[in-house]
Structure formats: C-alpha cells, structure tokens
Amino acid sequence: PYIPRRIRVTLSPEEAEEYAAARRMYTNFIRAHQIDFSERDGWTRFIMLSARLPGGRDAMKAYLKQRAIAQCSRAKLNIVWDIMRENRSERIIIFTADNDTAYRMGEIFCMPVLTHKTKAAERKDFLDRFRSGEYPVLLTSKVLNEGVDVPEASIGIVVSGSGSTREHVQRLGRILRAKGGKQAVLYELVSDGTS
C-alpha cells in the first residue's frame, strides 16, 4: 500500500566543511573526557561536563551545529520544495526530529507547524484545515508520531528522525490509513557523510 523512497542528500561544500569542523570539535571533547554514549549515563555526562569544563560550551554548540546541518541542509530544503511542487494535488506531512527544524522550515515555507507546544485548539484547527484541503501540507516534530490518524495524507517526507524502527512505523502509519485505495509514498531524506 505504500512506496518507500530513500533520497541520499549531499551537503554543499560549505556545509560539509562546517559539519566536519563542528563534528571534529565535538568528538575531540568527548574523546578527551572519555564520554561513552553507549553507557546509560553517557548523554547526561556529556551535558554535565560541557557545562562545567573549559571548552565544554563550545563542544555543545558544535554538537548542535553539526546536528542542525545534517538535519536541515539547503539540499534537503530544495528536495522538500521539489517534492511539494511535484505533488501539489496531494496532502503532505513533513516530519522532523526536533522543534527547531520544524519551526525553521515553517518559516522558510510559510507553513503551519505542529509540535508538542501547539495548543489543543490550534492543533485541532490545523488538522481540520489539513483534512479539508485548506492546508495541503503540515510540518510536525514527533507530535503526529502516535495517536493521530490523518488518512487524507498520501505523501510523507522524513527530513530528519531518530532512525528508530518504531518511529518509522509510526510515521508511516500516519499516511497509510485506508482511504480510497490510495498509493502512499514515504520519502526519507538522508544526509551523506553525516553521523
């Protein structure tokens, strides 16, 4: 009932350079302080040490920068635009890993954004307008992963995500509700050369 499409995205030379520099700063810090993310307290330890140690704030900023580049590069934005343009008659849900990416894209594309911060009345209004076709596209960061059926959507675009199978299945479920025998498509945008 659906077609999966994975699209590999290449960072621009400038973005690749910025990504590499930020990643290097971040990984140098975690190596120097023997932070192991496979341990239960790895992330907590990184946060604590980045707040306390010299170079820690820079390491945290570098972590956030490399993540932002991988999740929302110019190439990804261009591909999202192309997919929306090619599928004007379809309802589209765009999934992001975090609120910042969703809000950034919402500003760029002038689209409604649903996050956990969206008040219930506004969320209902957005979904009603989406269902009616007034809003052909919705942007969301995880809030539609569970518990909300949007059978009108036939296109999903995963701009960034956790990579977990559970999240993938939940997102796919948002666009695979039976309605008129539609053929749904789930695009997954993956940045090459990023972790």
Show where each model-derived region lies:
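Interdomain linker/hinge connecting the two RecA-like lobes of the SF2 helicase core
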Residues: 1-91, 96-97
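Hydrophobic/aromatic beta-strand patches that form the interior of the parallel beta-sheet core
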Residues: 7-9, 112, 157, 187
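Short, glycine/serine-rich, charged loops/turns that create anion-binding
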Residues: 99-100, 118, 163, 176, ...
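A short beta-strand element within the Helicase C-terminal
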Residues: 139, 146-162, 167-168, 183-190
